[in-house]
């Protein structure tokens, strides 16, 4: 270990206060977690201020890089061009996406935070995509609702366009707008591939962050509900190193991107990091009218 690493570790030790005695009837792990949360609440304002300063610095650095390209008369790289927050030229994809958030008791607090962040990113994706979907979070309750009503209250989530929060999961069983035979549950655990997205359909996406702890969770739920299941064509286009499960945000982005040209291959290449794409599958599929969904 270098002297710099030793000094960094020493500084880290100095910054972390010693853990007070563990109260009777509480495990050390629970006490440590509670103290960590308390330190976060006490220093939240400081952390937020540091985050704002960093964000401002990065924004200035990005602007400076863009100006350098302009001054040299060169084309600005795509990665430096920020997408507009709202796409004013959007058209309706004609589909509904339901984020099934009924798995609260299967996630820890950190995973609930991750899920809430994925929901906000799904909303952002729906605002920016060329084709929007009617997205609904159901059921919206327990810790997810609590987080939106507190930490994420300033997002004004109650007024999001094309994005609704429902108190129960009745919508998954069909309603006056869409019958049950027009509903499909998307899960990586089924064998049947989703060939195409069709207007007038309602697609359910499992809203759970579980690091693959619960095998076939969404598949079994869909079977119990009597809802047909399909999987995105992950195996055909990408290599996830053993894990065929995408985040909720990625699934929503892929579905929205699909409507640009109804080509799953292009959607995967556009949404997912290039390092995840399966080179063999990319070269094997180049048909103009893809079966690839």
Curated annotation (Swiss-Prot):
Q: What EC designation does it have? A: 2.1.1.221
Q: Which residues bind S-adenosyl-L-methionine?
A: 186-187, 206, 210-214, 218, 232, 244-246
Give the recorded effect for residue 212 to A.
Has weaker affinity for S-adenosyl-L-methionine and reduces catalytic activity by 90%
The primary location reported for this protein is cytoplasm
The cellular location(s) given in this protein's UniProt record come to: Cytoplasm; Nucleus
Extract the coiled-coil ranges from the record. 32-61
Name any GO cellular component annotation.
cytoplasm
Keywords, A to Z, come to: Coiled coil, Cytoplasm, Methyltransferase, Nucleus, Phosphoprotein, S-adenosyl-L-methionine, Transferase, tRNA processing
Q: Does the record carry Kinase as a key word?
A: no
Which residues act catalytically here? 210 (proton acceptor)
Q: Which residues form the signal peptide?
A: none
Location of region: Disordered: 1-31
Q: Where is the SAM-dependent MTase TRM10-type domain?
A: 83-279
The EC category is: transferase
Q: Which residues carry this modification: Phosphothreonine?
A: 16
Q: Which GO terms describe its biological process?
A: tRNA methylation; tRNA modification; tRNA N1-guanine methylation
What role does it play? S-adenosyl-L-methionine-dependent guanine N(1)-methyltransferase that catalyzes the formation of N(1)-methylguanine at position 9 (m1G9) in cytoplasmic tRNAs.
Q: How does it assemble?
A: Monomer.
Entry protein name: tRNA (guanine(9)-N1)-methyltransferase
Organism field = Saccharomyces cerevisiae (strain ATCC 204508 / S288c)
Give the organism's phylogenetic lineage.
Eukaryota, Fungi, Dikarya, Ascomycota, Saccharomycotina
Q: What gene name does this entry carry?
A: TRM10
């Amino acid at each position: 270990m270098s002297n710099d690493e030793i000094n960094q570790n020493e500084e880290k030790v100095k910054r972390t206060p010693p853990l007070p005695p563990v109260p009777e009837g509480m495990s050390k792990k629970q006490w440590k977690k509670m103290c960590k949360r308390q330190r976060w609440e006490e220093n939240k304002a400081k952390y937020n201020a540091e985050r704002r300063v960093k964000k401002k610095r990065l924004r200035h650095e990005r602007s400076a890089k863009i100006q350098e390209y302009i001054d040299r008369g060169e084309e600005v790289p795509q990665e430096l061009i920020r997408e507009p927050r709202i796409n004013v030229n959007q058209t309706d994809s004609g589909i509904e996406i339901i984020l099934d958030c009924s798995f609260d008791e299967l996630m820890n607090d950190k995973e609930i935070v991750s899920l809430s962040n994925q929901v906000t990113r799904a909303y952002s994706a729906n605002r920016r995509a060329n084709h929007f979907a009617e997205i609904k979070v159901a059921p919206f309750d327990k810790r997810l609702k609590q987080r939106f009503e507190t930490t994420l209250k300033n997002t004004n989530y109650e007024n999001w366009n094309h994005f609704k929060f429902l108190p129960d999961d009745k919508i998954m069983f069909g309603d006056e707008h869409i019958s049950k035979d027009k509903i499909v549950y998307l899960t990586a655990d089924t064998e049947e591939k989703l060939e195409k997205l069709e207007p007038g359909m309602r697609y359910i996406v499992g809203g759970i962050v579980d690091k693959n702890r619960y095998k076939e969770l969404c598949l079994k739920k869909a079977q119990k509900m009597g809802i047909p299941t399909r999987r995105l064509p992950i195996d055909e286009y990408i290599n996830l190193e053993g894990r065929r499960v995408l985040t909720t945000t990625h699934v929503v982005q892929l579905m929205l991107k699909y409507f640009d040209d109804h080509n799953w291959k292009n959607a995967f290449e556009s949404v997912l990091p290039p390092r995840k794409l399966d080179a063999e599958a990319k070269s094997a599929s180049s048909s103009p009218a893809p079966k690839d969904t």
